[in-house]
Amino acid sequence: MEAEDGRGYNVPCPQCSEINWAISDEGRYYCMSCHTIIEKTREVEDSEVFVNLGKIQYISRGLRKKRKQEKGWEWYVCEGFQFILIKQAESLQALGVAPQIKDEIICTFWRRYLQKTNQAYVKRPVYRNTLNLRESDSSATELDSETDEFSDGITTDASDRLSVATEDIASGSESAVSIQSGSVDGVSHTKMSKNWKPWNYVKMSMPMTLAFCYLALLWLRASITLSDLLRFVFEKRIPYFNAHQYLPEEIKLYGQDVRIFRMQSFPVYNDILNKAYELGHYLDLPRFPEIIKNCYLHPNVLCMKYLMEANLPDELHHWTCQVAEKTGTDDLHLLTFDPACKKARHIRYDVQAVALIIVVLKLLFALDDNTEWQLSTFAERMNQRDKEKPIFEFQSWYQTVRSCYEKAQQALEEEYGRFTWKSDCLLYYSHTSKAVLQKRKQMSENLHRQFSKLAGAAPDTGKQGPSSFLFKWDEQNTDRICFHGHSLEAILQQGDKPATAINTHYWLNSLKKCKSRICQHSELYEQSNFPRSYHFIVSLFAFLLRVEHCVVHHEVCLIEETFFQEFQGKKNKQKQKPRKQN
């Protein structure tokens, strides 16, 4: 229908400051430039009202149906998270994880979470109470108190789409969706505090979806560590950023839903790990399957993996196994996650493995900016005398790995700079800002298109397949030296059957354990306080795991404390004076 002319109204538009008015079929003024609707209505005569009464009623009924279609489904926040969890599980299946991770593991954890939070599978769902807390529109009406239970209305079709039974909701009612949120409980979910039961422990969020995935991987003992999981998230192989794009078109996001499902920061290693342990305790899960010796998460297996990743000799694996045995880090009771034991230390399997490697390197090379270079000079002389069997040289390894590490670090920083946070679909917090955001998005796309033409098309290298290794040292037709098969004869005592190191010096990162209740030593790491060789190795492994330096350094301190505890105990006993006998 054509809009009537509104040139008789000469007040500028409050949005675009232009005078270009028209009158809609409902009799309201709107700006033809920016489509802003104002409260002013057309003044009509009584006779005209009676003549067009039937026409107005017909038009209003049609507009009401159109609004309901634009609004989409009446959905809950937990439904949105369930769609995202399904897509994340399917992505993990595509990466090679066992098929039961979706239907048996994550689905079971999710049902238990819904039951523990009284959202489903209970007699009285929590939504009957949260609906009363929702801020509704002035034209909205309350839902019927006798609505069917949420758990009874959950159905999953062939495409794993969850739907909620809403037969008892009136077709013309607009009360289920607040003007501040596209979902039914978006406002109440955002305002809900941790002290309010049953949300006192775990509140669902996007980082919590990764906690679900990590618990499922840990239950299956899959060949994906937490650092690998976060790296796949950054590479967008697992839905996390702009995950709302995977939701059905009938689920509309705006208002508080944008704050719930839109992520503007990268997930942090320790944060996801703490959430996973917190979730396991909250769900009262049973003891997880044991981490046995041939399991991927066992320190002996992970140490071999990261020795290959760092281009270190294979003979170091024998030393890492000995240190793991002496420190007890290979104990299956300590490695296995038991949610019932709430005081157990959080096991960082990948960080613990690289910390074992660093401790072994300190035992053999000292890493004090002096001993390792002297041993490297001695190894170079041995290689000059006998060129058949290569002997490991620390200096040659340092130069080879450093050049590759710096290139990879620069490439990663460029990827961080090119990372796109904006989604293809438009997200808005209110209907009044929708037109403004649409204009901004259109201008941004036009500018991006123009700059792309000026800069020229970038060469498309293609997206590489997923891999657990960042560096491939054994590739042919490269100038890189592979040190995997090199010998450690230059740093070991000749003739000793139990191999002993030539180096007899070792410096400790920390001599005393901090007993303060609020300890921040694990979050502090000053580069100037440590030798450059040690800092380079910590930086290398921190880059491989995509964690901060303090995380790796703190794990090294914990292993050193356990490793030298027996030695320090014997030394203290020798210093004690014998008691005098009467």
Curated annotation (Swiss-Prot):
InterPro entries: Rrn7_cyclin_C, Rrn7_cyclin_N, TAF1B/Rrn7, TF_Rrn7_Zf. Residues 75-256 are annotated as: N-terminal cyclin fold. Keywords: DNA-binding, Metal-binding, Nucleus, Transcription, Transcription regulation, Zinc, Zinc-finger. Belongs to the RRN7/TAF1B family. GO terms for cellular component: RNA polymerase I core factor complex; RNA polymerase transcription factor SL1 complex. It comes from the Eukaryota. Residues 257-367 are annotated as: C-terminal cyclin fold. The keyword Nucleus applies. Although it shares weak sequence similarity with GTF2B/TFIIB, displays a similar subdomain organization as GTF2B/TFIIB, with a N-terminal zinc finger, a connecting region (composed of B-reader and B-linker regions), followed by 2 cyclin folds. The RRN7-type zinc finger plays an essential postrecruitment role in Pol I transcription at a step preceding synthesis of the first 40 nucleotides. It is found in: Nucleus, Nucleolus. This is TATA box-binding protein-associated factor RNA polymerase I subunit B. Zn(2+) binds at residues 13, 16, 31, 34. GO terms for biological process: nucleolar large rRNA transcription by RNA polymerase I; RNA polymerase I preinitiation complex assembly. Residues 70-74 are annotated as: B-linker. Its main location: nucleus. A zinc finger (RRN7-type) spans 4-39. Residues 40-69 are annotated as: B-reader. One of its GO terms (molecular function) is RNA polymerase I core promoter sequence-specific DNA binding. The keyword Disulfide bond does not apply. Component of RNA polymerase I core factor complex that acts as a GTF2B/TFIIB-like factor and plays a key role in multiple steps during transcription initiation such as pre-initiation complex (PIC) assembly and postpolymerase recruitment events in polymerase I (Pol I) transcription. Binds rDNA promoters and plays a role in Pol I recruitment.
